[in-house]
Amino acid sequence: MQRIAVVPGSFDPVTLGHLDVIRRAARLYDELVVLVVHNPGKTPMLPLGERVALIERVIRDAGLPDTVRVDSWGAGLLVDYCRQVGATVLVKGVRSQLDVTYETPMALVNRDLADVETVLLLPDPAHAHVSSSLVRQVEALGGDVTPYVPAAVADALAVRRAG
């Protein structure tokens, strides 16, 4: 039986921390779906389609195997998506105890609703302070985001800023 896991996130934009979690999760599961989700509580900097395209490029540039794919989910419960693709695990990156506190109730509900387990991965310490919201703030103020994002993302943001 194939072990399929989903790494959900808004990825607005995808960071080196995200890539670290994706890379490590890809080694743990037979198939990994990086799921770009619409979060109704957030106003995205990048449209959903652009985020999907950027993550696809980042995954390709990182040389990750074909067992890693990207998809998007516009609305609904993550466990419904998991059922559709046969996934039994959600993988989340957690940077701090605050992230663990935030993720715990959702993990318990996901397990209750669909018998989907949540695996929390700690980041590489080099990326533990990086978040998409931090990158958006630095970008909005004209700062250099290259230490925090893959090259394809830095390039796309530079083009966007110039454009």
From Swiss-Prot:
Keywords: ATP-binding, Coenzyme A biosynthesis, Cytoplasm, Magnesium, Nucleotide-binding, Nucleotidyltransferase, Transferase. One of its GO terms (molecular function) is pantetheine-phosphate adenylyltransferase activity. It comes from the Bacteria. Transmembrane segments: none annotated. The record marks H18 as: Transition state stabilizer. GO terms for cellular component: cytoplasm. GO terms for biological process: coenzyme A biosynthetic process. It is found in: Cytoplasm. The keyword Nucleotidyltransferase applies. Signal peptide: none annotated. Its cofactor is Mg(2+). ATP binds at S10, F11, H18, G93, V94, R95, E103, H127, A128, H129, V130, S131, S132, S133. Substrate binds at S10, K42, L78, K92. It catalyses: (R)-4'-phosphopantetheine + ATP + H(+) = 3'-dephospho-CoA + diphosphate. Its EC number is 2.7.7.3. Pathway: Cofactor biosynthesis; coenzyme A biosynthesis; CoA from (R)-pantothenate: step 4/5. It holds the Pfam family CTP_transf_like. Its main location: cytoplasm. Homohexamer. Reversibly transfers an adenylyl group from ATP to 4'-phosphopantetheine, yielding dephospho-CoA (dPCoA) and pyrophosphate. NCBIfam families: coaD_prev_kdtB (TIGR01510), cyt_tran_rel (TIGR00125). This is Phosphopantetheine adenylyltransferase. It comes from Clavibacter michiganensis subsp. michiganensis (strain NCPPB 382). The lineage of its organism: Bacteria, Bacillati, Actinomycetota, Actinomycetes, Micrococcales.
